[in-house]
Amino acid sequence: MALVVQKFGGTSVADADRMREVADHVKRTRSRGDDVVLVVSAMGKETDLLLRLADEVNEEPPGREMDMLITAGERKSIALMCMALEAAGVPADSFTGSQAGFQTDGNHGNAKILSVDPHRVRDSVDKGRVAVVAGAQGMSTDNNVTFLGRGGSDTTAVALAHGLGADACELYTDVSGVFTTDPRVCPTAKRMESISFDELLEMTAVGCPKPVMRSVEVARAFGVPLHVRSAFTWEPGTWVLEEAPDMERAIIKGIVPDTSQAKVTLSLSLIHISEPTRPERIE
């Protein structure tokens, strides 16, 4: 029996149909004998909608109130996800970031995790239930709700996996893993079965979008195995490990295209470089 943390992004829980599919997937995972903890993001474009509403009310809203507003999207998701799980016959409990034991600094809008004490999540799992945790949020040391920033749900999942001693952290997205290059640019790009943390961080730094760099850094620091998978095909994705088990280590693992840069080459043969003038000797 394994303990698996599964994170689902906004597109994966965008509507009721998607939530029912996720609930069915969790049910299949549990049927194999595994315990499951879910981390979910806000539904679809919910965060963008909340940001627009805030801007309509106040062009310079206070950071504390923005965090209170934005994190409401994830709280909506965890409640609905638990309802979908219960409808599928899977007992579940929802937890906000603070209820799950996430303590952060007070940097509203981009808070950093200071510690995680997930004893309530562990108690739920030990009772045979699925714990559903709101991503990208916590509680500051002065007891204010905080938002971890964009991509914070991935970081939540990795930190929670470490805190629980989980066997793996599965990040479900709208792509089926990490590819040798951008499949939108090169349709023949191959999905990699495994890649090392260092290799993925290198690709992320120059444009590879998922999973976000911050979560990979946390996973590498604490040795949390990541499994990047598709929430739409459910097929095996890409394992991200300390060392990828290649039979023969590839010299080039992947290529990240960057259309935002241009290269200008100047030929020295076309450039006249004057000889430096020497000062006249003073007698």
Residue positions per predicted region:
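Nucleotide/pyrophosphate-binding catalytic subdomain
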Residues: 1-216, 271
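Flexible, glycine/charged-enriched surface loops at secondary-structure junctions
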Residues: 35-38, 211-214, 225-231, 235, ...
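A broad, low-specificity signal marking well-ordered, structured residues that form hydrophobic/aromatic
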Residues: 131, 146, 226, 238, ...
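Acidic/polar residues at beta-strand termini and the immediately following turn/coil
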Residues: 182, 230-232, 283
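Acidic-aromatic/histidine active-site loop/patch
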Residues: 219
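A glycine- and small/hydrophobic-rich beta-loop-beta segment
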Residues: 223, 232-270, 274
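Single conserved hydrophobic/aromatic residue that forms the stacking wall/gate
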Residues: 271-283
